[in-house]
Amino acid sequence: MKKLAYFLTAMMLVGCSREFVESIYDINYEPTNRFAKNLAQLPGQFEKDTMALDALINSFSGNIEKRWGSREIKVAGKSNYVKYIDNYLSRSEVDFQKGTIIVETVSPTDPKLHLKNAIITTLLTPDDPAHVDLFSSKSIKLEGRPFLYQQVVDQDNKPIQWSWRANQFADYLIANKLKVKDVDFKKAYYVEIPLVENQVEIRGYKYADIVRRASRKYDIPEDLIYAIIKTESSFNPYAVSWANAYGLMQVVPKTAGRDVFKLVKKRSGEPSPEYLFNPENNIDAGTAYFYILKNRYLKDVEHPLTLEYTMISAYNGGTGGVLNTFNRYDRKRAMRDINSLQPNQVFWALTNKHPKAEARRYLEKVTNYKKDFNSGKT
């Protein structure tokens, strides 16, 4: 998975515009972002990483461009799943925010057969990110309960768990929903499949036991954990981001992950991407980082609601960003200022004056999702 970090870096360095990065990853690309902070902490690492850029671009984005053209490069993100198969001729994209699946192929021979295989693969992809390589065209071993089980229904309004039903639905889609478009001087055959209306809730319910255990273990409210997961990944365990963050709670190995290992797990090193793609590990690590924020970095915040607001903001933009909102030069003065204000005043400052636009939006999103959770919505 080191290739992922190199690839996303490469995309930003070799032609992807600021607007492209912002639109794909929903961030405001500022010098203070988490990715830049990671590089600053590892001054020799960036130079080392860039040595592999050309090879990685040729092996991944180069293969995509060769098949699909430069305007049709799609990669997995925080709230979308993208998987290539069939030597990059076929792919699927699940957009969890839009609630749609697009499965398509540019195979020059037997395109309907290739499309059918891609549809079946998409519908039966297992609910285990460890078995799916998002950054190659390797095939997927279709076993176990599908990741999209109950999030998609067939023409008879039935969930799809078994091969025979996936085959039947694929035939139906190709016979009734097939579309064709031009892609880089070739034809792309595709179908669009809607996710069910409550797809977010279905994914969220899968992690209820894990969230409950993490909440009790670290004394962090369940509604806050759910709100963070929904904000970070839309309950997508395959989530990856430009900031080298992984999984449901988008844990960055070199920062939050390293802190959790050192301060909570009492072990050296940092979690691997494979470790963080495991939902239980990821939720445990993300919640443990909230424990660190609460009991170490922000332990001097006095009001419980103010503490929650500052924790949420710090999870996205760092403790330094929170303190800089109130005083850029004196951290002790910043803490005194925070404690002199009412929680609603702190909330206003963090959503209007925080140095990072992404962090300003983040606090609003999380608090809104918390309200949804407590009103019966996931």
Please name every model-derived segment.
Residues 233-242, 258, 317-329:
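Secretory-pathway/luminal and periplasmic proteins that interact with or process carbohydrate-rich
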Residues 242-269, 284-292, 340-341, 366:
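Substrate-binding/active-site groove segments that recognize
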Residues 219-240, 251-252, 286-287, 311-316, ...:
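Short, functionally critical alpha-helical segments immediately adjacent to catalytic or ligand/cofactor-binding
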Residues 15-230, 295, 300-301, 328-378:
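Cell-wall glycan-active module
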Residues 282-331:
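Catalytic and binding regions of secreted/periplasmic enzymes and modules that target cell-wall glycans
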Residues 261-272, 299-304, 333, 337-338:
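Short helix-coil transition/hinge motifs at the ends and kinks of transmembrane helices
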Residues 199-202, 273-283, 357-358:
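Active-site metal-coordination segments of metallo-dependent hydrolases
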Residues 2-9:
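Sec-dependent signal peptide recognition
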